[in-house]
Curated annotation (Swiss-Prot):
This is Probable indole-3-pyruvate monooxygenase YUCCA4. Keywords: Auxin biosynthesis, Cytoplasm, Endoplasmic reticulum, FAD, Flavoprotein, Membrane, Monooxygenase, NADP, Oxidoreductase. One of its GO terms (biological process) is response to ethylene. It is an enzyme of class 1 (oxidoreductase). FAD binds at residues 21-26. NADP(+) binds at residues 183-188. Disruption phenotype: No visible phenotype, due to the redundancy with the other members of the YUCCA family.
Length: 411
């Protein structure tokens, strides 16, 4: 008797690039390619666009920078949007962006492995449903693909709720509770501020030095002021000006337990990727005592935490505002372009292109403006190659979501 053999995974040939990730970065590349007539396919592990924004951000979140610094290529924000759009408005902008350029990602496709095949000269991207194959691979999973959970001694002993900010929505779930907030970046500051709205008692852990700047100065964006000054003055001089501005509006934050780094805010961002905190009200609550600043945690106990200064405090809940990391090393089988942490080895502005048709977007540590820059560069480069392979007519005859399915069965 004959036996039925298991069929090979479905082979899906993509005439244009495969883009992994349907966040703003992946959509920006797809839009720029579509505008040039080059097809692409986006593989997205979740069931929606911009899943970080839709599923892993808190309700009160707004863009930290003015909207004109956060626009995706080819489509500005609506004029009636406020200077700092809310999370909900940004999501609506992203959805409108995808609709305008007819971008239709393949959802619920978790990339298990992507590797280059030297024999065929193609990238093979394996998901649970098949293997996508293309000449080009664009990594658009970004710097914030996975939450970072710190290794704090005793954390598993704690009997109360422990929540990463990726799962935090609002302070309503922590009303009237004493909460330990681990982390003092923009998320840690904003979560602490939000907790105060619900009469919670946040204690924010500050382990390292941190730059805090006012978000605005006399109605002008601090970031906008910095970008304008950098066109005319050296970086170190602009950093000195920003610190003078911060001290004049926020006071000496060292006195609040927020030590400033010796390196200036912009230089530190460029070198390490550490973003300065843009204050939206937390500093005044720290000064009034509504938000407590604490030293680094020595260990977590069943009911609270012991600190390096010897103090021990009981807490009802712990919120981990400890950021995110790249997940590229988990699935991309390539070790010459990315570091072991999953970041491009080549710094901005040249970190968008690797070898053998590999590209990366959303890893600039320069927010959405860096994403837009990379997306345009990638689309230009791929279009040049596409034209050589296919000619100008092909660019207009294939829609952006076109893919060819090839089924191979064992004999």
């Amino acid at each position: 008797m004959g036996t039925c053999r298991e069929s090979e995974p479905t082979q899906i040939f993509v005439p244009g690039p495969i883009i992994v990730g349907a966040g703003p970065s992946g959509l920006a590349v797809a839009a720029c390619l579509s505008n040039r007539g080059v097809p692409s396919v986006i593989l997205e592990r979740t069931d929606c666009l911009a899943s970080l924004w839709q599923k892993r951000t808190y309700d009160r979140l707004k863009l930290h920078l003015p909207k004109h610094f956060c626009e995706l290529p080819l489509m500005p924000f609506p004029k009636n949007f406020p200077k700092y759009p809310s999370k909900q408005l940004f999501i609506s902008y992203v959805e409108s962006y995808a609709a305008r350029f007819n971008i239709k990602p393949v959802f619920n496709q978790t990339v298990e492995k992507a590797e280059f095949d030297d024999a065929s000269g193609l990238w093979n991207v394996k998901t649970q449903d098949g293997v996508y194959t293309s000449t080009w691979l664009v990594v658009a999973t970004g710097e914030n693909a996975e939450p970072v959970f710190p290794n704090i001694p005793g954390l598993k002993k704690f009997t109360g709720p422990v929540v990463h900010t990726s799962a935090y929505k609002s302070g309503s779930a922590f009303a009237n509770r004493k909460v330990l907030v681990v982390g003092c970046g923009n998320s840690g500051m904003e979560v602490s501020l939000d907790l105060c709205r619900y009469n919670a008692l946040p204690h924010m852990v500050v382990r390292n030095s941190v730059h805090v700047l006012p978000r605005d100065f006399f109605g002008l964006s601090t970031f906008g002021i910095a970008m304008t000054l950098l066109k005319w003055f050296p970086l170190k001089l602009v950093d000195k000006f920003l610190l003078l501005l911060a001290n004049s509006t926020l006071g000496n934050t060292d006195l609040l337990g927020l030590r400033r780094p010796k390196t200036g805010p912009i230089e530190l961002k460029n070198v390490t990727g550490k973003t300065p905190v843009l204050d939206v009200g937390a500093i005044s609550l720290i000064r009034s005592g509504q938000i407590k600043v604490t030293q680094a945690v020595k260990e977590i106990t069943r009911n609270g935490a012991k600190f390096l200064n010897g103090k021990e405090i009981e807490f009802d809940s712990i919120i981990l505002a400890t950021g995110y990391k790249s997940n590229v090393p988990d699935w991309l089988k390539e070790n010459s372009f990315f570091t072991k942490e999953g970041m491009p080895k080549t710094p901005f502005p040249n970190g968008w292109k690797g070898e053998k048709g590999l590209y990366t977007v959303g890893f600039t540590r320069r927010g959405l403006s860096g994403t837009a820059y990379d997306a345009v560069k990638i689309a230009e480069d791929i279009t040049d190659q596409w034209m050589k392979f296919n000619g100008p007519l092909s660019c207009r005859n294939i829609c952006s979501s076109h893919i060819i399915h090839l089924h191979f069965n064992k004999s």
